[in-house]
Design a protein with these regions (language model features):
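Short, Lys/Arg-enriched N-terminal segments with co-localized hydrophobic residues
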Residues: 1-6
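N-terminal compositionally biased, intrinsically disordered segments and leader/signal-like regions
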Residues: 7-8, 29-31
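Bacterial N-terminal signal peptides that target proteins for export
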Residues: 7-17
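Bacterial N-terminal signal peptides
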Residues: 16-29
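Short, glycine-/small- and polar/acidic-enriched structural segments
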Residues: 35-179, 183-188, 202-209
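A residue-level marker of the well-folded mature domains of exported/periplasmic proteins
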Residues: 186, 193-198, 213
Length: 213
């Protein structure tokens, strides 16, 4: 799945402008060209594109462009969208499903695609799960584990309305099932990880960085 990220275009006349500002400072003092920074509240998940924005802020590149970046952390893209009004963020980076559902309802605009992180989404089950006993039930998807008999009635922990939720739905479709054939428990990633580690659920669907744990 994909995520948005901000891309910065540099002015080819930046050096000339810098020289102009230095001259202005020499002539009339620093107060003549110093402008208050524009606050920019943004929302992010613990993913790759967030590091890029964090690094830019650490280096002071936001202030160099007249911005004062604020990074709000969230556990899922659905939470980012749900709290859009209360958090009052202007720009965010989320997965495909939250972005698409929000844009279709005219709640936001998609301004760019950052990268393809579909490989970071995964469904995990325990080593002794019957789901792992069959592979290739659907001849069109020979590498996919599970069959209707081993999956029907099982409990899956997943943050609803996310890319992982969509992936789970598509996996069920490959096996000839749908969400009504299983039990879905809605939990945010950190809570879901703890619950699964404590023995709850038969499988869990998440994305990076949880999938690396």
């Amino acid at each position: 799945w994909v995520d948005e990220e901000i891309m910065k275009v540099r002015n080819p006349f930046a050096g000339l402008l810098a020289l102009f500002f230095v001259v202005a400072w020499c002539l009339s003092g620093s107060a003549a060209f110093a402008k208050p920074l524009v606050p920019l509240r943004t929302a992010w998940l613990g993913e790759h594109e967030t590091f890029l924005v964090w690094y830019a802020r650490e280096k002071g590149w936001d202030k160099a462009e007249g911005l004062d970046l604020e990074l709000l952390p969230f556990e899922s893209g659905k939470n980012v969208i749900d709290e859009m009004q209360s958090s009052n963020w202007a720009i965010a980076g989320v997965g495909a499903m939250p972005a698409l559902t929000a844009s279709l309802s005219s709640r936001l605009y998609i301004v760019g695609i950052g990268n393809d992180e579909s490989a970071s989404n995964a469904i995990f089950t325990r080593a002794d799960s019957p789901i792992l006993k069959m592979k290739g039930f659907n001849p069109n998807c020979p590498e996919v584990y599970g069959n209707p008999g081993s999956v029907r009635g099982k409990t899956f922990i997943v943050p609803k309305g996310t890319s992982a939720h969509y992936m789970l739905s598509r996996w069920l479709h490959v096996l000839g099932l749908n969400e009504r054939d299983v039990n879905i428990v809605d939990m945010q990633p950190s809570e879901a990880m703890k619950a699964f580690a404590d023995g709850q659920g038969d499988a869990i669907a998440l994305w990076a960085p949880q999938t690396f744990e």
